[in-house]
From Swiss-Prot:
Family named by the database record: Belongs to the class-II aminoacyl-tRNA synthetase family.
Lineage, broadest ranks: Bacteria, Pseudomonadati, Pseudomonadota, Alphaproteobacteria, Maricaulales
Annotated TGS domain residues: 1-61
Catalytic activity: tRNA(Thr) + L-threonine + ATP = L-threonyl-tRNA(Thr) + AMP + diphosphate + H(+)
Source organism: Maricaulis maris (strain MCS10)
Binding note for cofactor: Binds 1 zinc ion per subunit.
Gene Ontology MF annotations: ATP binding; metal ion binding; threonine-tRNA ligase activity; tRNA binding
Gene3D superfamilies named in the record: 3.10.20.30, 3.30.54.20, Anticodon-binding domain, Bira Bifunctional Protein, Domain 2, Threonyl-trna Synthetase, Chain A, domain 2
Database matches in NCBIfam families: thrS
Protein name: Threonine--tRNA ligase
Keyword Metal-binding: yes
Sequence segments annotated as region (Catalytic): 243-536
Amino acid sequence: MINVTLPDGSKRELPDGASPLDLAADISKSLAKAAIIATVDGQDWDLKRPLDGDAQVAIITRKDDKALEVIRHDTAHILAQAVQDLFPGTQVTIGPAIEDGFYYDFARSEPFTPEDFEAIEKRMGEIVDADLPFEREVWDRNDAIAKFEEMGEAYKAELIRDLPEDETITIYRQGEWFDLCLGPHLPSTGKIGKAFKLMKVAGAYWRGDHRNAMLQRIYGTAWADDKQLKAHLHRIEEAEKRDHRKLGKQMELFHFQEEAQGQVFWHPNGWRLYRTVTSYMRRRLEAAGYVEIRTPQLMDRKFWEASGHWDKYRENMFISSIDQEEKVLAVKPMNCPCHVQVFNQGQKSYRDLPLRMAEFGSCHRYEPSGSLHGLMRVRGFVQDDAHIFCTSDQITAEVSDFCELLKSVYADFGFEEPRIKFSDRPEQRVGSDEVWDQAEASLKAAAEASGLDYEYNPGDGAFYGPKLDFVVKDAIGREWQTGTIQCDFNLPERLDASFIGDDSEKHRPVMLHRAILGSLERFLGVLIESYAGKLPFWLAPRQVVIATITSDADGYAEEVKAAMVKAGLHAETDLRNEKINYKVREHSVGKVPVIAVVGRKEAEDGTLALRFLGEGGKTQEILSLADAIARLSEDAKAPDLKRV
C-alpha cells in the first residue's frame, strides 16, 4: 500500500501502482473530474502517472494558479502538431509556456503569414476536439536520438545529446504526434479548451545565439476560459493605445535611432518631464538625509575585478581598450563600487553612520538588440541610485525609513501600495554562505520589523546580496518592478570599506543598495503608459498652450504667456492662421492638459477660455488672467511642495 499525505495534513491509503487520479477519485467524483495535474513531493506530476511510493500529494484543478502554465504548455504542443500537420518538413525545436502565453520555435524556409495563422488555429481546434490522450513514455537515449534523426528533427536530436548521460528521456505523445518533453500535461487535448489565440511571429536564433540558425517563433496566448482570453485581448488593445513609443512621438518627448541602439534622444518636452521628476526626487532625498555625489563613467578593469563585477557581470559590460596605455576600461553597469570609493576617502567613525549617498548615476549595460523596447529596455540609463552605509544595528531602521519614503513617492506619482518580493541567494554569487546567511537574516528581520507583507522569490537575489523588490501596478493592471533595496555584506569586504567603532577598532559597514524609481527611463515609460500620456498637471511638459482665434489676439496671447512663465508655468502660444478647433484637436492629441483660447473678446476683457484635456474640449471655463494663473500655479506644484 501507498501512504499519501494531503495538503491539509490528512492521510489516505492507496494500492501500489495508484496514480494521483485514483487519489482524486477516492476523495470525490467532482475532484477527479476537475483535476488536471498533481504535485508529488513538490514535483509536477501527470494525473495518470503511477506514484513511486509514499508521498505528499496535491491535486491541481483548473482554478489553481499553476493550471495556466500547464494549459499554455499543452497549447504549445498542439501548435507544434498543427504546424507539422499543415506544413510537412517543418522542424520543431522548443516551445515553453511564458508569461500570459506560450511560443514555439520552428525551422522552416518559408515565412509564416497571417493567413497561415487562421489555418493553424483551425487545425489546433480540431486537435482539441479530437480529445487525444497525452501519454508519457520513457525512451532509451540512443533510440530517441536515432528516431528524431530519422524524422529529420536535427534540433531535437541535438537537445537529447546535450542532456546529461543519466537524464531520463521522456516523450509525450498525443495521437500519432510526439515531442521530447519533461511534462507534465493534462489528461488529454480536449481538457485544454479553445481559449487560445496566436498573436505574432518573430525571428529567434536557435538557443538565443546569433551564431546559430534563425528560426521562426510563433507566439500565442492561452487561458482557462473565453472570459479570461477576452479580458487579456482587451488589455493588449489598451496597452497598444498607451504605447509610450507612440505617445512619445505625439507628445514630442524622445526618439531612438539605429546609430545609438538602446539609447534615448530626449527632446525639449521629454527632457522637461525628465528634469521635473529628478528635481522632485532630489528634494525628497535631501529631506530624507541623503547627500548627492557624482562618480566616473569609465573605470579600469582591475577595479571591476576587485568588486566581483568582472567575473559575474562581464557579459553585460561595455569594454574599451586603450592600446597606447595597454589598459582595459569598462563603462560602469552599476554605481555601487564607485560609491564605496567615495566612502573610503578619509577615516569614518560610527558617529558618521548611517551615511546615505545618492547619485543619479548614468549606467550602461549590454542588452541584445532584439530585446530592446523603447524606454522600457535600453542600454544607457540613469538610476535614482543610493547606498546607505550603516551598522548591523541600523539595518532595520534604515529599511523601514526607506520603505516609508518609497511608498510616499509612489503615491505622489499615482501608484497604489506596491507588491513586495523577497529574493535570496542566486546560483551565481560572491561571498561565503555564512555571509549570505547573515545578510538574508538581517534583511528578513528588517522587513518583518517594518511590518512588510512580502512574498518569497527564491534564487533571484543580486550576485552580492539578498533584496526586496517593489512592484507597482499601472492603470490597466500591468505590474512593473521598479524599486529595490539590497543588503550587502560582500562589497564592503571586497573593497576594504571600514569605520572606527565605539570600541576604537575597525569594522566593516553594511551596505544597503536602494532605488525607488529604478531606471528613470523605464519609470517614465511606465508613467506615460499608465496615464495614457495625460500626465498630472505638475508633470506635464507642456502645461498650457494659449491658442488664438484671430490675429487680433496675438499681442494679448504673448502677454498671457509672459505672465504664466513668470508665475513658473510652462506656457506656449499658438498664433498660426488655423481654425481654433484644429488647434484644440492638435494639442489634445499632444496631451496638453490646458488650452487657453483667446480671441478679441478675451483680449478686451482680460480673460481666458480654458479647455481641459479629458473633457473633449466641449466645455470651457472663463476666468480672469489673474484667477487662471492662481489656479494653475497651485495645480503645477509638485505633491511634496503642496505639503510644505
